[in-house]
Amino acid sequence: MNKIILTDCDGVLLNWEGAFTNWMSMRGYKVDENNRREYHMGKRYSISSEEKDRIVRAFNESAWMKYLNPLRDAVYYVDLLHRKHGYTFHMCTSLTTDEYAQKLRIENIERLFGKTAFTKYIFCDTGADKDEALEPYRDSGYLWVEDKFE
């Protein structure tokens, strides 16, 4: 049995939301207090869907991708599963198709989780659905870890 875990990145491994909140604040955007817990960033900031798409893409293609903090206990559990139990991870994320932003994301993952825990990186465009990218894993029996419930 291959000991592989498929995982999303933002909201599972990295604190994308916290970094995005700081990035937006530095640019003068304020969270709509009535929508503070909203998953959809357009609603959270009371901006149009088009503006949200443009802003999220700009953030995802920024140098911030190299410096996102890990989410809660992600480093501990990835390390435990990798070193003690022999699992490796394949990451699938809707970051961007920009190759330089992707390199920054990989550098950050390797800095936080080490160079051997993640053996494959799959990048989809900003906000894109991951179904097509995950199709090769259908019926593999691998665990898929995702923060967006659907």
Per-region residue spans from a language model:
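Metal-dependent phosphoesterase signature
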Residues: K30-V31, Y39-D79, H85
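A short, structured active-site edge motif that brings together acidic residues
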Residues: N35, H90-T97, I106, L112-E132
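Conserved Lys-Pro-Asp/Glu-containing loop-to-beta segment of HAD-superfamily phosphomonoesterases
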Residues: F123-E150
